[in-house]
Amino acid sequence: MSDQLEKDIEESIANLDYQQNQEHHETEQDKDKEHQDVEKQSSEEETKGIEHVTDSNTDVIGVTKSQDTEEVIENSPVDPQLKEQQESTTKMSLSERDLVDEIDELFTNSTKTVTENNQPSETNKRAYESVETPQELTPNDKRQKLDANTETSVPTELESVNNHNEQSQPIEPTQERQPSTTETTYSISVPVSTANEVERASSSINEQEDLEMIAKQYQQATNLEIERAMEGHGDGGQHFSTQENGQPSGSSLISSIVPSDSELLNTNQAYAAYTSLSSQLEQHTSASAMLSSATLSALPLSIIAPVYLPPRIQLLINTLPTLDNLATQLLRTVATSPYQKIIDLASNPDTSAGATYRDLTSLFEFTKRLYSEDDPFLTVEHIAPGMWKEGEETPSIFKPKQQSIESTLRKVNLATFLAATLGTMEIGFFYLNESFLDVFCPSNNLDPSNALSNLGGYQNGLQSTDSPVGARVGKLLKPQATLYLDLKTQAYISAIEAGERSKEEILEDILPDDLHVYLMSRRNAKLLSPTETDFVWRCKQRKELLLNYTEETPLSEQYDWFTFLRDLFDYVSKNIAYLIWGKMGKTMKNRREDTPHTQELLDNTTGSTQMPNQLSSSSGQASSTPSVVDPNKMLVSEMREANIAVPKPSQRRAWSREEEKALRHALELKGPHWATILELFGQGGKISEALKNRTQVQLKDKARNWKKFFLRSGLEIPSYLRGVTGGVDDGKRKKDNVTKKTAAAPVPNMSEQLQQQQQRQQEKQEKQQQEEQQAQQSEQQQEPQQEQQQEQQQEQQQEQQQEQQQEQQQEQQQEQQQEQQQEQREETQQTEQEQPDQPQEEQQQEKEQPDQQQQEKEQPDQQQPDQQHPDRQQQEQIQQPESSDK
């Protein structure tokens, strides 16, 4: 399409040249007649007409007395030849304007077709400029030839007037030759047609002089044909020939650089001529600019780099909203998901949720590599390399978006840190240790309304901060200090398992002796804060413990990796607003446009969640009932954005110093007897009621946490905590060594850690099975022994029964004997009565009977055979008295 446009323009230029040649030929024929008519006029009339022309040309500011000038022009006679010449000139200008209009129509048609073909409009624009400018200059050159004779005729007329009026006021040649600007010429509004014709003739003369000046300045700027230009400046004819033959094309003239000493910058006339030449190009340039602005308004960006920056920096700045979006998605997953779900997402990429999380992490990592291939954590130097230095004053072009850029960097670095700990991004402990303070201790407080997701492309207000980005870090708080020390410990364990360096070298890198100097330099402070002082002291204690560690339990078991992960993600999920926005993030309000019911529900929800300290009693139930979210009034997207969770029936309540002192005093008095402690310090306690809002479970957990703190810190356990059960080693098993690691101490792989946990569970089950088998075997071995014992017991029981039977028999025998003795006594008495002569024999028998009883007692073994024949004894006893009777 551009070739066809060039052909059309060339044809139109050729037609214009042909018309101008014809008009120039006609003007040459009328030249002689014009001089003759001018000489016939009277000197007075000629003087009045010439004064009117010169006054109209030399008045730069504008003719203030237009009425006087109009009267002079009306009274002055006008030659018909001059009128015809002026009419031909106006016709020529009209034809030129028509040709320019045709070229404009061709250009607009070409731009429409080009935009339909998805081609840039600048190509057609440049083609138009390169072709149109010669078309603009060529008629001007021809006009110089056309007006050359007219210009020479005017001085002759002026000379005749000067000769005729020598006694009157002389007219200097400089005033006669002084041109007037195009703007001044067209600013004169004369209603008479003759005045307009005279002004048009003078404008052609002024335009010729302006073009001569532009050509001369161009030759001086390019340092070409200087001598020739100087000669042309002295000789008018030579100068015209130079203008015809040596004038360059319009495109090169406009695109050339005007030197600082050029007359174009000092002469109003030349500046006006230069402006008139470039006016048509400016029209097309402004039209294309309006078209491009209308197109870009449909393609907004949150942040737009200036067009004069290098293309690479423009790409990095314009891509920040994309990087911010990906980092925000990763952080939302961490903030809204429980710890176990996060571990499952990172360790199970085969599932649908795990594959989605893996793709999101990969996309985030790929986008981040645009900024740096080597450094995992980004700074402002990666966004604008060579322009923006970390810790230095922010460049003025970035100040309107300074807080937006800094908040994006914080999101990206925090998401990178968490992904590295999960093992989804390969980053070693070295980078985590070096960047911990930058990520978890923000210094500047940012406004959440300046987030890239909330900004528009036309918001260019100044965003200032307390200090330059990256100049310093914030204060180290207690939770951050605990995480920092645990991170250093995990880095030491990983480096020791790699086995490439000694303990002393690793500890000197991770826990240096001049750690306090490093903390003060990062914060630009002269003194350490109390938390930092405590942190330095704990680091020294941990260093001695790790250096002299000789216990049988491995360090990887003593300081478990999953315990550190749980503490890390719990802290991030609770303080994610502070990590991104600083202190202003804690009081951040919802700035989105919600439904009418949303704000009321959010106020009720936040009002209930901001009362965690109101507990009813030691039962642990919350006194304030949590608000219920109505799903019929609130949108699902609004509930997700507000992170509304179901409130738990019991809220955690922070321990006060008074409660901690009471618990310590109670442990010193009674030890870990929680019911007794509540009797002394609970509701209606005998000593005080400091623990009236605590339960036995809370007391036990608090005491265990105290004991774990001393164990992890390597400190001596106080006497009042020695009776408390539990410790760091509860529920832990020995872990297998991770595969070979580098000296950079890589972060443990999540899948490997889970496999190790499964192996531990399998080992535990196998041990339980072995114990059960051993128990069964021991039972089987004990069965015969039990049978023997049972037999022995049965025998013993039988013997006891026999003894009891014997005792019973003996008792029966004794009773029988006593009965027999009584009977015998009765019989003896009867016999005594009947036979009184025999008393001596009875006495002897009575004496013999106790002797027999004594013999029976002395010889118990002889009683058994006697018992077997009781009848026999009776017979003997009966026979004895019979014998006595005889």
Swiss-Prot record:
Biased composition (Polar residues): 107-122, 149-206, 601-615
GO molecular function, one term: double-stranded telomeric DNA binding
InterPro entries: Homeodomain-like_sf (IPR009057), Myb_dom (IPR017930), SANT/Myb (IPR001005), Telomere_rpt-bd_fac_dimer_dom (IPR013867), Telomeric_DNA-bd_trans-reg (IPR052833)
KW Mitochondrion (keyword) present: no
Biased composition (Basic and acidic residues): 22-54, 139-148, 729-739, 761-770, 844-860
Coiled coil regions, renumbered to chain: 2-41, 747-835
Induction or repression: Expression is under the control of transcription factors SWI4 and SWI6.
Gene3D superfamilies found in the cross-reference section: Homeodomain-like
Domain HTH myb-type, first and last residues per copy: 648-703
UniProt keyword list: Cell cycle, Chromosome, Coiled coil, DNA-binding, Nucleus, Telomere, Transcription, Transcription regulation
Annotated Low complexity bias: 616-627, 771-821, 830-842, 875-886
Gene Ontology, cellular component aspect: chromosome, telomeric region; nucleus
Region (Disordered): 1-208, 231-252, 589-629, 721-886
Protein name (Swiss-Prot/TrEMBL): Transcription factor TBF1
Gene name of the encoded protein: TBF1
